[in-house]
Amino acid sequence: MMPIKVEIVSPEKVLFSRAVDMALIPGLEGDIAAMPDHAPMMLLLRGGVVELHQDGAVTDRFFVAGGFADMTETSCTILADQATALSDLSVEAAQARLAELEASYDKADKMNVPVLDLLMAKMQSARAEIEAAGGPAVQGA
């Protein structure tokens, strides 16, 4: 099988740039596999783990906090709001971020739907980060 060129880019830097057999990506509506000859598409991302596969094994894992992916027949570029290697995640930092977001949600104007939606998306991402870092699964409100 021909490889697919994958790039994972955060606002700070390029975290990954290499050809792999497949990238499993956390899409907003479910996970999707980016593989060679995939139909071109743009994909909104939810907070979750990107798994990179080579020779039948997972070689690299990154947490993305959202963003989007641009998939073509030969490449996949992931532009993440935040991206971190799984080995660099901290359960405690993600739990603290979730607590801050929950406090902000509690104080937010319940009539301001765009702000509430943004806070809900960030809380979902923080919950996914806690789980990706090896912490307990956290149920959302």
UniProtKB/Swiss-Prot annotation:
The keyword Membrane applies. Pfam families: ATP-synt_DE_N. It is found in: Cell inner membrane. Keywords: ATP synthesis, Cell inner membrane, Cell membrane, CF(1), Hydrogen ion transport, Ion transport, Membrane, Transport. It is a peripheral membrane protein. Its main location: membrane. Belongs to the ATPase epsilon chain family. F-type ATPases have 2 components, CF(1) - the catalytic core - and CF(0) - the membrane proton channel. CF(1) has five subunits: alpha(3), beta(3), gamma(1), delta(1), epsilon(1). CF(0) has three main subunits: a, b and c. This is ATP synthase epsilon chain.
